[in-house]
Amino acid sequence: TTQHILKDKLTLNLIGNASYREQRAPGSLSSEVDPVFGTVKRDFDINPYSYALRSSRTLDPDEFYTRNYTPFNIKDELSKNYMDLNVSDVKFQAELKWKITPKVEVSALGAIKYQASSTEHHIEDSSNQAQAYRSMATSIIQSNNPYLYDNPDEPNRDKYSILPQGGIYKRSDFRAKSRDFRASISYNDTFNDKHILNLFGIVEVNAIDRRATSFQGWGLQYDMGETPFYILDLFKKQLEENTQYYSLSNTRERNAAFAGTFSYSYDYRYTINGTLRYEGSNRLGRSRKARWLPTWNIAGKWSIDQESFFEPLRPAFSSLALRLSYSLTADRGPTWVNNSTATIYPLNPWRGATEIREPALSISAPENSELTYEKKHELNVGLDMGFLDDRITLSMDAYRRNNFDLIGNVVTMGLGGAVDKQGNVAEMKSQGVELSLFTRNIERKDFKWQTNFIFAWMDNEVTKLKTMTRMIDYITGTGYSMEGTPRGSLFSLKFKGLNEMGIPTFLAADGSITSTNIQFQETVNMSNLVYEGPVDPTITGSLGNIFKWKGFTLNVFMTYSFGNVVRLDPIFSNGYSDLTAMPREFANRYLNPGDERRTNVPVIASTRQNNDISNLYVAYSAYNYSDVRVAKGDFIRMKEISLSYDFPQSVSSKLRMSGLSLKFQATNPFLIYSDKKLQGQDPEFFNTGGVAVPMPKQFTLTLRVSF
């Protein structure tokens, strides 16, 4: 609400909003990268999309099969292994404006915001995950089940369950309270109808207090009145693994900034403006040297259409302006990097034996006195054009950016007591072009047609990078970066064909051809990796058309993306079960000697091959991350099609309404184009299991009534 006090000199604006959301999602654990086996796995993954994609179509959807040594049915598991999410958000804001004179205005704004979210993971008694922790029907299962407890104090005893009854209840809560205050003063004046001067000053401070808690309740009996049932050996096992069954984390973020801007325009033709900002934060640690940083921006605009020589160009040209800006901006970097002074954290050292326990303090990150903000210089040139009384408008921007002091991990000689340190270790340059074209193609009384076209091209290169990581990080997920390649580049192992047995072979780091001598945890020699391309597109944009005829409005909106690569789903393995779906690539697999000359799809490894060839799993993991398992990420997508009808006023008035409309909308209905090598895989979706699903097709019918 807005209330005017003292006529128009004093204005009070009050805003309040609140939201609450409940959601239920499939139960999910965190994914893990195995650098030895070369796999990315997630235990007890019941993601419906992943299950539908990778499960055999011969399975009866109502039957139970064996998984994790215990009965499993996807529909039953989804009903007994789920997460309840609750999110609430409340914000109140008040702004007071005082117009001291017609040219000077001061304002003060205060806001408080509270956010709270909770995630409750319910793993019920009869769920597959809970039963896996007590499955020991036979001695073979008992010795092979990884979820049973092998008591180190009783070496002659068989493994046994630490969850003899009940299920598992996991809860995590996150709360954040932020307080913001901003005071500003502005001065606006015009001299002789030619000189326009705007001055603006601002002071702002904000504080954010965050609290995160987590808890794991083992043995909660969902089928017995939700009564806990746990045994002593559960805590013994957690102590031996140094596992914390509850946690509490508080963080306090404080920020302050002082800024001033000026803008001067002469005769509506030439405009220059600048900004100077001095901000500070405690995000980088307690050191005052890393706390404050000045940033600035200077820009100019030449409105060519206001020049006298432009008049003969009308009406073909209706507007023309040239823009130029140069700036220094900064970012505080990752939230976990705060070692401008040494960071000391408490911990419980692992001692193995449960009777030996002690708290301790550890230097988690040694001091980096030179730690500072991540910075960026940007030069931007823009051109705005209008034709035929602005029926056609074109806006173009070209930019060049130099990022420096980027924060990352650097490997040192360890003289300071730590090998890995966080610091400003990287630099990157980028350039790009952005274009926006709007046209009013047809404008008649009963029919209108408008088109909006957006095009963006971007290219970047990491020019300096002092860091090291494992080979598995370069070839999985969203890739990694090397000097001379774009940020977020995808690499692959070089596939060298199938051998005479149908086993895939690759180029090893020493230059030899191998099937199993691939070290996924290698951090130094990456000469056997092939650069595939960036995981982020270099060309993006959209094309939208709006047609209006009488009361009907048709909107057709498409998006496109080109220039990136995607990793195909890692579906190959040295062993499969009857529960696994066979993808269509298997129709072209190696079957008989000599097939290695006609196909790149490896053989389904036999039991004998698994016994005779040690570490055969490495060959199939490497094949999943080889250059033959990469496709282009290019696509053109029909993003939205909608048809709406606004009923005439005569109809709505008869119904005692001020307005009545009906709208049908289809969102993400289909892909117009994508790489055939994807074979139906969504180029915008990276399947990580858990709760990840591709963008769904949505069809919405909306009736809008106003009174």
Region annotations inferred by a language model:
Residues 214, 423, 440-535, 566, ...:
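Conserved small-residue
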Residues 1, 47, 51-52, 60-67, ...:
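Surface-exposed beta-strand-turn/loop segments characteristic
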Residues 532-569:
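Glycine-rich, aromatic-lined ligand/substrate-binding cores of catalytic
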Residues 32-73:
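Acidic, glycine-rich flexible loop segments
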Residues 3-10, 15-20, 24-29, 67-123, ...:
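Extracellular/periplasmic, surface-exposed regions of secreted and cell-surface proteins
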Residues 129-151, 561-661:
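Extracytoplasmic gating/loop element in the C-terminal half of outer-membrane beta-barrel translocons
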